Amino acid sequence: VDLSKYKVLSKVGGALMVGNVKNIPTALVRTGKNSYQGLDLRCTHQQLTSKLVSGTYRCPAHGSEFTKTGAVKVGPAEFGLNKINTEVVGKTVILG
């Protein structure tokens, strides 16, 4: 992900729906000054793709909600979204 192309990632807490990475629906979240976290957007309850709505990832099936960093906010999901490794190289974040 070229950081210079996405203003939403210029601030800590910014989140970008990246699309599919290795067939996994993926988001990228800025978690610190120079740190980013990839998230697998498949709900840990029934594997449907969660969508970012008003700063919260929501599953369309049963209403599970997750924070921007993937922690469970509202069930029925019992586990947070799975993390995807990231590596920052210059102004690019490599996912996976």
PLM features: residue spans?
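Extracellular/periplasmic metallocenter environments
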Residues: E65, T69
